[in-house]
């Protein structure tokens, strides 16, 4: 695709608006959807709206962060610090994000009970299955195993660099959860735990004991399968979790 400053310079079949009308919004990439919001690119760097949108997502994902998580909590000041994003583009992006939040909040609330590895895998499938990069996520639960929040903590290449107990339990405490399930994916599809997976689980079980917040399981998701470390290992016998 030619990243010139004007959408008009892109072939009609590749323009985001035209593609949305032709094939539907759900088939557009994240960059294409943002490009529709901001309308124009950055002429100083010869970027089309799509090119600038890709740059915004790349900037938000620095440090192995989830770009959507960053956008959900971003401010006008943070957005305008990105080259090519002025107040108008920042306002357009933030308006789109806020509208999405309000639509989501208007949905009838459905309580999701996560009381088995299978239920946890279903809750995590959209975030972790069929991903090209390794992702680490946490399910925040209440005392009755009702799902409070699903958070992708980090995105990276190796389990040992993906997650730190501090980051994981910060999410749990922030959401007022009383128990958690952690999970990450193996892009290869092999759901057998690596030595690093076992070491990380051991550290997190120890942290959970200290904090009094039980870690219920650690799942590894593949392409269309998953494995439960609680079922496969004796770690939970070695580090009994608080009730």
UniProtKB/Swiss-Prot annotation:
Residues annotated for Zn(2+) binding in this entry: 184, 186, 197
Coiled-coil residues: none
PROSITE patterns named among the record's database cross-references: MPN, UPF0758
Keyword tags: Hydrolase, Metal-binding, Metalloprotease, Protease, Zinc
Superkingdom, taxonomy of origin: Bacteria
Domain MPN: 112-235
GO biological process, one term: proteolysis
Xref: NCBIfam families: PRK00024.1, radc
UniProt xrefs under PANTHER family: DNA REPAIR PROTEIN RADC (PTHR30471), UPF0758 PROTEIN YEES-RELATED (PTHR30471:SF3)
Family: Belongs to the UPF0758 family.
Protein name as it appears in the record: UPF0758 protein SYNPCC7002_A0220
Phylogenetic lineage: Bacteria, Bacillati, Cyanobacteriota, Cyanophyceae, Oscillatoriophycideae
């Amino acid at each position: 695709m030619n990243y010139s400053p004007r959408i008009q310079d892109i072939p009609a079949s590749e323009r985001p608006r035209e593609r949305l009308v032709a094939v539907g919004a759900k088939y557009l990439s994240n960059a294409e959807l943002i490009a529709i919001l901001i309308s124009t690119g950055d002429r100083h760097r010869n970027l089309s709206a799509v090119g600038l949108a890709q740059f915004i997502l790349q900037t938000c994902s620095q440090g192995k962060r989830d770009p959507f998580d960053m956008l959900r909590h971003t401010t006008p000041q943070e957005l305008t610090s990105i080259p090519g994003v002025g107040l108008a583009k920042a306002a357009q992006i933030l308006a789109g994000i806020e509208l999405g939040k309000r639509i989501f909040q208007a949905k009838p609330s459905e309580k999701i009970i996560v009381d088995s590895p299978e239920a946890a895998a279903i809750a995590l499938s959209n975030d972790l299955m069929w991903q090209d990069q390794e992702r680490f996520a946490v399910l925040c639960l209440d005392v009755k195993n009702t799902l409070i929040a699903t958070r992708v903590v980090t995105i990276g290449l190796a389990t040992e660099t993906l997650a730190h107990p501090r980051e994981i339990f910060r999410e749990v405490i922030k959401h007022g959860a009383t128990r958690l399930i952690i999970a990450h994916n193996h892009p290869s599809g092999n759901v057998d735990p690596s030595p690093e997976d076992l070491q990380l689980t051991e550290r997190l079980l120890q942290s959970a004991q200290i904090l009094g917040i039980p870690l219920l399981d650690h799942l590894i998701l593949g392409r269309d399968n998953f494995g439960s470390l609680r079922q496969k290992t004796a770690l939970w016998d070695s580090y009994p979790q608080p009730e």
